[in-house]
């Protein structure tokens, strides 16, 4: 399992409310397998007087199992409901693994015997 971070820079009309950002992880069929959004997480972004800002999303553990995934980034309204802009498949991930687990993610678990 790896860790990673993703920095998103944005520019918006400074007269608009502070926006939100979100990312979605999709598999090769286009199915969204995970997402994260600043609004959903209760994080208020900051922007300067010209409407520019940035946010860094930290993934301490990325529990994806082997496969190819793409990342789409969104700039949203302050309530996270409507996208102002999006960048489809801005990143491609190739995940490898050593074990035999099947599926999309590895679930935290313990065995008791």
Q: Model segments located where?
A:
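Localized sequence-composition bias
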Residues: 4-113
């Amino acid at each position: 399992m790896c860790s990673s971070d993703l920095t998103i820079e944005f520019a918006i009309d400074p007269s608009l409310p502070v926006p939100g950002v979100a990312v979605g992880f999709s598999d090769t069929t286009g199915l969204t397998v995970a997402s994260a959004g600043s609004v959903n997480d209760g994080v208020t972004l900051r922007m300067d007087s010209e409407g520019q800002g940035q946010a860094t999303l930290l993934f301490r553990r990325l529990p994806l199992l082997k496969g190819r995934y793409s990342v789409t980034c969104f700039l949203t309204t302050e309530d996270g409901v409507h996208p102002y802009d999006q960048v489809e498949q801005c990143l491609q991930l190739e995940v490898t693994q050593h074990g035999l687990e099947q599926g999309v993610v590895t679930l935290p678990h313990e065995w008791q015997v």
